């Protein structure tokens, strides 16, 4: 998925005719397949200086991503982690703007169970490979997402994604 501007306000945007504009967020969701297994990551970059609202939104998804990754461990439910992300976005002024589950498992298929979702009360297990992908989608304005994937351990979450969480502005 590559989407920009108001078109990016759809989490699973399909190709369109939207042209890049100064200040736009560009959402890039991609992965690879190796030995039959999938990877998944998303980064959002900006073409020129983003608006104050877009800066605040990016800070909110970054905070939600990093706090959820720091809390993830075996024994928590997918709902526990999802609810934490929603609470962070609410505190940052973007409550209700995520519109999708916080994450999903990745394996032979790109979307597998267990999910980091309000509908998953089951405990995560060590060895589950899951994404953490908070997003904010404001209809008619912009969308953005910050997604990593990694493995749940007994007492932590080991991130596989090797890419910065810093805001990237392309001049």
Regions found by a protein language model. Name each.
Residues 1-171:
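Active-site neighborhoods and metal-handling regions in enzymes and metal-associated proteins
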